[in-house]
A protein has these predicted regions:
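Short, flexible turn/loop "capping" segments at secondary-structure junctions
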Residues: 45, 78, 144, 188-190
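Conserved amphipathic alpha-helical segments that form helical-bundle/coiled-coil interaction surfaces
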Residues: 115-176, 191-199, 207-218
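Mobile beta-alpha loop/short-helix "lid" or hinge segments that flank ligand
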Residues: 72-77, 167-170, 186
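A ubiquitous short alpha-helical element
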Residues: 90-94, 109-113, 132-135, 176-183
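Short, flexible helix/strand-to-coil boundary loops that buttress conserved ligand/catalytic motifs
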Residues: 80, 90, 98, 164, ...
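A short secondary-structure junction motif
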Residues: 35, 39, 167-178, 219-222, ...
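Short linear motifs at protein or domain termini
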Residues: 1-114, 224-227
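C-terminal all-alpha effector/ligand-binding and dimerization domain
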Residues: 2-9, 20, 128, 177-227
C-alpha cells in the first residue's frame, strides 16, 4: 500500500472521539452512537472491531460489547467473518424507517406536549440558538440531534424512547448520504424546528405533529424524491 493510499484511507475513516479510561463499555457505546447519529458512517461501510478500537483508543473487549448492542439495535450487521457491515441503502428499508419514525416520534411528541413547561420550550430554543451561532453551512447534525432529543426526552417514556433511539441509529447512516447530496445546501436548517416550537407555545398538538412530520419527510425526500 502506498503512502498516498494510506493517507486516503485515513481521511475516509469516521471521526470517533477518544474514550476516557473510566466506564469504557458505556463510553464506547455512546461514542459509537454519536458517530451513527451524526452521519459518520455510510450505508454499506465495512468495519472491524480492531479498526473501531484503534479509533477509540481502547481495547477490543469494551468495543465488542458496544458493537453487540448496536447489532441488536439494527445499526450494524455481524458476519461470520467477523466483519461488521453498516446496512446498505435500500428503498424499502428507507420507507420502513420513515414510517416508523413518523409513527413513533409523533407518539413521543404527544406525550412530551402533555408535560409541556415554559422551561422545556426555552431549552428547545437554546439548541437552535447554539446551532445558529456556530455558523454551519448546511444542516448541523449534532444540533439537529440535540433538538429532537430535547423534544423527545421530555416525554419521559421508558418504552417509546429506546425505540426512537434505535431508529435514529439506523437512520443516521442516511444522514451521511444527505450531507453529500448536491441539494444539501438548499436545506433550510431549522424551518420546521421553529414551527414545532411555535406550535408548542400555542398548545397546538396538530400543528406540532404536522411540523414534525414535514421535518422527517423532508430528509427522506432528498434521497428518494417523489415521482
Amino acid at each position: 500500500m502506498t503512502k498516498a493510499s494510506r493517507a486516503q484511507g485515513a481521511a475516509n475513516r469516521p471521526r470517533l472521539a477518544p474514550v476516557a479510561p473510566a466506564s469504557l463499555r458505556e463510553t464506547a457505546y455512546r461514542s459509537l452512537c454519536e458517530a451513527f447519529n451524526t452521519g459518520q458512517f455510510a450505508p454499506g461501510d465495512t468495519l472491524t472491531l480492531q479498526m473501531l478500537a484503534d479509533q477509540l483508543g481502547i481495547s477490543l473487549t469494551p468495543v465488542r460489547e458496544a458493537v453487540r448492542r448496536l447489532v441488536a439495535e439494527g445499526a450494524l450487521i455481524d458476519t461470520p467473518s467477523r466483519t461488521l457491515i453498516v446496512p446498505k441503502f435500500d428503498r424499502q428499508r428507507m420507507e420502513e424507517l420513515k414510517s416508523a419514525r413518523l409513527a413513533l416520534e409523533g407518539l413521543v411528541l404527544d406525550r412530551a406536549m402533555a408535560r409541556s413547561t415554559p422551561e422545556w420550550i426555552v431549552a428547545l430554543e437554546a439548541t437552535l440558538r447554539t446551532s445558529d451561532a456556530a455558523g454551519h453551512k448546511g444542516p448541523d447534525l449534532r444540533q439537529n440531534h440535540a433538538f429532537h432529543f430535547t423534544l423527545y426526552n421530555h416525554a419521559d417514556s421508558e418504552v417509546l424512547l429506546p425505540m426512537v433511539q434505535a431508529l435514529w441509529l439506523q437512520y443516521g447512516t442516511y444522514l451521511n448520504l444527505i450531507m453529500k447530496h448536491p441539494q444539501v445546501g438548499r436545506i433550510a436548517d431549522h424551518i420546521f424546528h421553529y414551527a414545532i416550537i411555535e406550535a408548542l407555545r400555542r398548545g397546538d398538538r396538530d400543528g406540532a405533529r404536522a411540523a414534525l412530520a414535514h421535518d422527517i419527510e423532508r430528509s427522506f425526500r432528498v434521497l428518494a424524491p417523489d415521482p
